[in-house]
Amino acid sequence: MTYSLLPHIHSPQDLHALSLDKLPVLCDEIRNKIIESLSLTGGHLASNLGGVELTVALHYVFSSPDDQFIFDVGHQSYVHKLLTGRNTEAFSNIRHDNGLSGFTTPQESNHDIFFSGHAGNALSLALGLAKGSSNSSSHILPILGDAAFSCGLTLEALNNIPADLSKFIIVLNDNQMSISENVGNIPQGISQWIYPQKISKLSQKIHSWIQNLPSFLHKKKTLSHKVDIALKSLSHPLFEQFGLHYVGPIDGHNVKKLVQALQMIKDQPQPILFHVCTVKGNGLTEAERDPIRYHGVKAHFQNTSLKKTSGNVELQTPISFPQHAGNILCRLGKKYPQLQVVTPAMSLGSCLEDFRKQFPDRFTDVGIAEGHAVTFSAGIARSGTPVCCSIYSTFLHRAMDNVFHDVCMQELPVIFAIDRAGLAFHDGRSHHGIYDLGFLCSMPNMVICQPRNALVLERLFFSSLLWKSPCAIRYPNIPANEKASNSSFPFSPILPGEAEILCQGDDLLLIALGHMCNTALTVKEHLLDYGISTTVVDPIFIKPLDRKLLQSLLTHHSKVIILEEHSIHGGLGSEFLLFLNQHNIKADVLSLGVPDMFIPHGNPETILNLIGLTSDHITQRILSHFKFSTPIPIERFFKA
């Protein structure tokens, strides 16, 4: 495609210089740019395609950054980035090294007001901005999808909107989708609440009937007014009960109508709910037909709108931990006919679709409501029914009190399948699963474990149903290096606190969590080049630790390395040091994990190099710390 307009848009001011008639052409160019770029990099595709005209119209009518846009979640901000000076090579590398973030990021641009990545917070943030703003001429526009209205935080914010708040426009992008199909009563009821077509038609018929009454009935006008009041009481949109003036619904793919509507409401003196109807994936046939699959795509996704190339197909990858977990849950579902599975809007990402299809009555997607997912699971467990709550590590933060108060304090045997435990790499700082141990380890009654491969994952899932206590099984979104057995119950149960020695040596004790065992075994081989032999242990459990085994090993190992893909604060290293202190054991401990910083997005090798968790870095850090020999200077691995 030839780009005649987009290359000349370096800021919203350049957009303002275009005539209204040129905006549809610009929208076509933006849509094609996104498809071309993401076919090489992967990223959030369908939501951005669906929001092209809306974002162009917003930037055309308002003046960012003086007028402030707050994107809920932020993964649908690619168009916003293109219109605010980021149509550069960095966009072509989005979510990769030297590329833009896939979410709004203030470090990139002053047009991005907040870091984003989690759902439901835009309205609260926007209200806070409005409360604290000294600029009375600035407009504040939170931009939310309809799925965000199922978030408790959004409803709490709706309850707090002042009726006299001016220049505050809530933009509702209604595509009737979350990542997958919307669930629950709130998203499904939005159209009925705010666009009551039957009542509108009834109003027209009644008014027509009144106008045809005999002219000597002088109270026709009064009667019409009373009818209006009565019908309005029936059709009053939900959002007007919160003091909002409702405008819409507007065709979200007619950029001219969007501009005209926004210009009309721009300076109204009350808060406004601007309702826009869009099609997720609009402009790409495959994405329109299957917006769930095309919500987030990998590089080289199937795309018939571009010229076919030999690489323009889905690449086959090894089976991942989440895929194994989904398969294991299906097997458990057959073995335990009462087993329930709960997820907060992550059925597809956590590979639960097969369970949902096989056992629809035993599967619940609660929508973007992590706290409810946890407490709902607690209620299921209290009834005596086995339950697994599958949830991303980064989203579990949002339900910390629910885990504490409703699960652990009640001593309920909820199984938490904690997906994406580890670095998220391309999704960046808001999605890394490297903080959950910091609060889970402090929860009484909680058993926490992490498998190094699919076989251990299988053992943990099957065994967890026998523990009768709250438990968390953590696993990353990376290939698992061994296949599961696929037997119904092919092993004796593993008990909480059972560790496993992977290899034995005389000089060092290396304790590695989960998939970092693979790195540890590579490091062990590197250390042999220096004449150093290493005992490598997979603790399997972070809580409780295998105290008996550790005490035995520490009688002849005084040099210990802890290796984990988790924050250095509050993880396995912290638990091990507490264990040493409680047992008055002295040891020289090198704790290696994710440093105390927000980790950016990037390719895996780049991020692991940045934080010093490659096998080469770890080897040199061990040599340097324990002074076994003269190592390669560590500074060479940390270039500025």
UniProtKB/Swiss-Prot annotation:
Thiamine diphosphate binds at H75, G117, H118, A119, A147, A148, N175, E370. The keyword Isomerase does not apply. InterPro entries: Dxylulose-5-P_synthase, THDP-binding, Transketo_C/PFOR_II, Transketolase-like_Pyr-bd, Transketolase_C, Transketolase_CS. One of its GO terms (biological process) is isopentenyl diphosphate biosynthetic process, methylerythritol 4-phosphate pathway. Its cofactor is Mg(2+); thiamine diphosphate. The keyword Metal-binding applies. It is an enzyme of class 2 (transferase). Binds 1 Mg(2+) ion per subunit. Binds 1 thiamine pyrophosphate per subunit. It comes from the Bacteria. Pathway: Metabolic intermediate biosynthesis; 1-deoxy-D-xylulose 5-phosphate biosynthesis; 1-deoxy-D-xylulose 5-phosphate from D-glyceraldehyde 3-phosphate and pyruvate: step 1/1. PROSITE patterns: TRANSKETOLASE_1. Coiled coil: none annotated. Keywords: Isoprene biosynthesis, Magnesium, Metal-binding, Thiamine biosynthesis, Thiamine pyrophosphate, Transferase. One of its GO terms (molecular function) is 1-deoxy-D-xylulose-5-phosphate synthase activity. Mg(2+) binds at D146, N175. It catalyses: D-glyceraldehyde 3-phosphate + pyruvate + H(+) = 1-deoxy-D-xylulose 5-phosphate + CO2. GO terms for cellular component: cytosol. Its EC number is 2.2.1.7. Gene3D superfamilies: 3.40.50.920, 3.40.50.970. HAMAP family: DXP_synth (MF_00315). Belongs to the transketolase family. DXPS subfamily. Homodimer. Catalyzes the acyloin condensation reaction between C atoms 2 and 3 of pyruvate and glyceraldehyde 3-phosphate to yield 1-deoxy-D-xylulose-5-phosphate (DXP). This is 1-deoxy-D-xylulose-5-phosphate synthase. It comes from Chlamydia trachomatis serovar L2 (strain ATCC VR-902B / DSM 19102 / 434/Bu). The lineage of its organism: Bacteria, Pseudomonadati, Chlamydiota, Chlamydiia, Chlamydiales.
